Design a protein with these regions (language model features):
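Short cationic/low-complexity microdomains
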Residues: 2-9, 59-80
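Charge-rich, solvent-exposed alpha-helical interaction surfaces
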Residues: 14-17, 21, 40, 47, ...
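Short terminal alpha-helical segments
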Residues: 1-32
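Amphipathic alpha-helical binding modules
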Residues: 73-105
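Short amphipathic alpha-helical segments
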Residues: 14, 65-69, 86, 90
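Amphipathic alpha-helical interaction modules
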Residues: 24-68
């Protein structure tokens, strides 16, 4: 009855991909003064948008899965040393992106 409600396999894979993508593009402690930061952020934003769109085509998240997504991203980024205010804001932004993309599919 609740089998799919608590199934977070796809959510965990997506969250892990997001954390790895951010870590690869903008390592913790990056210098915002670098000349390529804006280009890297633009490419990261584009990749996140594309992956989020494809993720929401195959997954409709319930409240538990949305919370799991935010928590998994938050835990992963904090483990890599990103500042807590950035992590909180970023994880909520990803959940908002997923919610918006889910509505437009």
């Amino acid at each position: 009855m609740f089998g799919r409600f608590f199934d977070t396999t796809a959510v965990d894979e997506y969250a892990d991909w997001v954390v790895e993508e951010v870590k690869r593009t903008l390592p913790a402690g990056f210098d915002p003064g670098l000349k390529n930061v804006s280009g890297k952020v633009d490419r990261l934003d584009r990749r996140l948008s594309e992956r989020t769109a494809s993720f929401t085509k195959s997954a409709k998240l319930n409240i538990y899965q949305k919370a799991r997504l935010a928590g998994r991203i938050r835990e992963g980024m904090l483990a890599f040393g990103y500042p807590k205010p950035f992590v909180e804001s970023f994880s909520m932004d990803i959940v908002k992106r997923v919610m918006v993309a889910s509505r437009t599919r």
